[in-house]
UniProtKB/Swiss-Prot annotation:
It comes from the Eukaryota. InterPro entries: Insulin-like, Insulin-like_sf, Insulin_CS, Insulin_family. This is Insulin. GO terms for molecular function: hormone activity. Disulfide bonds join C7-C36, C19-C49, C35-C40. The lineage of its organism: Eukaryota, Metazoa, Chordata, Craniata, Vertebrata.
């Protein structure tokens, strides 16, 4: 997922993969700006984990 734009189900699947058993909270529109409109890093994704 590094260097890709992640949108919709691809973004959700990637969050499941990154957060694993911790799960993640329902992100606000900010994650769409970070990961769908732009490219986000693994560290940015980790900020959405519980």
């Amino acid at each position: 997922y590094v260097g890709q734009r992640l949108c919709g189900s691809q973004l959700v699947d990637t969050l499941y993969s990154v957060c694993k058993h911790r799960g993640f909270y329902r992100p606000s529109e900010g994650i769409v700006d970070q990961c769908c409109t732009n490219i986000c890093s693994r560290n940015q994704l980790l900020t959405y984990c519980n």
